[in-house]
Swiss-Prot record:
Superkingdom as given in the UniProt entry: Bacteria
Keyword line: Ribonucleoprotein, Ribosomal protein, RNA-binding, rRNA-binding, tRNA-binding
Assembly with partners or alone: Part of the 30S ribosomal subunit. Forms a loose heterodimer with protein S19. Forms two bridges to the 50S subunit in the 70S ribosome.
InterPro entries noted in UniProt: Rbsml_uS13_C, Ribosomal_uS13, Ribosomal_uS13-like_H2TH, Ribosomal_uS13_bac-type, Ribosomal_uS13_CS
GN (gene name): rpsM
Entry's Gene Ontology cellular component terms: cytosol; small ribosomal subunit
Protein name: Small ribosomal subunit protein uS13
């Protein structure tokens, strides 16, 4: 397995697909990286030469934020919003959807498991 940006990418897949295993790289960015490195997108990772792997590593490390750096930046951005207590920060603090989604009947995964309220009884008709 080739190691790029501290991630083992699979050998038996095409280069474009393998690069998407790196956090922060989608299919569009992977294709863009292949074009910059002048490597065919359809080439399998196991047939890449050492020189091609080195050029891929250099392009990814120097021009893109991936893996730990990207995760750290996202976490710091969320923390900053929480600290200044803007609307999105308050939604993060309350563990509610941030981008305007409905919460009346949905958002179970974001809100967590439903909690029973003590002392509240259902009325029988």
């Amino acid at each position: 397995m080739a190691r790029i940006a501290s991630v083992n990418i699979p050998d038996n897949k095409r280069l474009v697909v393998s690069l998407t295993y790196i956090y922060g790289l989608g299919s569009t960015m992977a294709a863009e990286i292949c074009n910059k490195a002048k490597i065919s997108k359809d080439k399998k990772v196991k047939v890449l030469t050492d020189q091609e792997l080195i050029s891929l590593r250099n392009i990814i490390e120097n021009e893109y934020k991936v893996e730990g750096d990207l995760k750290r930046e996202v976490t710091l951005n969320i923390k900053k919003k929480k600290d200044i207590r803007c609307y999105q920060g308050l939604r993060h603090i309350r563990k509610l959807p941030v981008r305007g989604q409905n919460t009346h009947s949905n958002a179970r995964t974001r809100k967590g498991k439903a909690i029973a309220i003590a002392g509240k009884k259902k009325t029988v008709k």
